[in-house]
Amino acid sequence: MDTKNIYYEHDDTSGTSICVEYEKYLYKCQSKYQNIEVIKTRIYGNVLCLDGCFMLSEKNQDYYHNECIDLTPKKSKNILIIGGGDYGIASLLIRRNKNTKITIVEIDKKVVDVSKEYFPKHFKLSSQQLNNINLIIDDGMIFLKKNLIKYDSIIVDSTDPVGPAKILYSKKFIKLCNSSLKKGGVIIQQSGSPINDMDKLIKPLVKKYDSVGLKSITISSFPMPLYPTGTWSFIKAKRA
């Protein structure tokens, strides 16, 4: 097989790689925060890669998004999404309940623009639905420091804890999330592979959640073919 048409994602910690054959590059740029690429593949359709890691594909994006939606209480009327610039989670939430108020805080506007161009599915919303989604281009940590609103649910839909996203897995950030939740509100955060990341990410994250007073902490796993090990997870907890 001609390796010039193979896109690799390699995990140094586990020493494993995942790869996909691509037909061509559709987009490539270096934003202020990360390297952004979109490749066209036969099996997965368009695929979004950030800093060399597979993020989103036309064919299997719903595994991730639907799992997150299922974890989000239906009674949530005011939801904050940190990250989520592809609009995948936001669009499914607004379709589930058109009266839901959603705030997306995405650090990189390029992610929104590229997603709208190459993954348009989640941007095909009615004017009423779009009016209920408030997009803010900002750092999630900075936003929470000045935030005065209490949310029913907070979803942290970020990249892995490296680079700009590293702070989103800190105790300081989780404490800010907790204080921004209504009583009984929930936080949902992507927590990596339950196979590769249990000791280095998931268990430490559970301890941080517990240390700030979050309760009913659970880990949910789901299939994600383009992510390392093919299985991914969300951590969920509730403000007491």
Predicted regions and their residues:
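Short, basic/glycine-rich phosphate-binding loops at helix/coil junctions
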Residues: 44-51, 186
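The AdoMet/dcAdoMet-binding core of the Class I SAM-like
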Residues: 2-9, 56-189, 196-203, 210, ...
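Active-site beta-loop-alpha junctions enriched in small/polar residues
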Residues: 192-194, 222
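C-terminal lobe and adjacent flexible extensions of AdoMet/dcAdoMet transferase-like proteins
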Residues: 236-240
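Conserved S-adenosyl-L-methionine
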Residues: 214-225
